[in-house]
């Protein structure tokens, strides 16, 4: 389940062209639609569509933050344009909102709003770097679908996003940066869960950079494959079969 997603959906019903949900919330939506369970997730990863943003959306967003009485409101500094809001007083609201934008100061502050810088020693979302790349940004928005009134992306699109997030976190860990091993593991495990509902006859043409990332991901995870895929609903499926089919779906090297 995704705490507060119904509140979010109702509040932003008139702004479905301004954003797309990715990450764990997107996994929940596509798996739930297929009648499958997904791990609990407490945050909403929101990609803003800069071409459609306006003052009305910014006003509506700040109204949502104020209604939920979020205790912590943060903004990244520098190149990564990232907003984080968490720990609302109203328990009916999502615990955390993480917004990704490609233009600075997209959320004009309300008169009494204050954004503190995200601490340097706190890593930004593993999905934040994705939006700095034109290929990923267009890939997400060109693939947008609607599930129960919420704009998101289908499972075959979430898989490459999760693969890139896994690669980024793994690279940081290998460079000696502090990374929660569970954050790395969840992205890989989510891909196996999503595999249950990816249509085997799908064929996805990936932009060059995303294709390269998928290649790198499959090569890396093949070095240390899980002993069983049963926890992900794939008890009768071998790891090599998953890799082979993903290569076919995304037109990768066999």
Model-derived segments and spans:
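Compositionally biased terminal segments of proteins
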Residues: 1-254
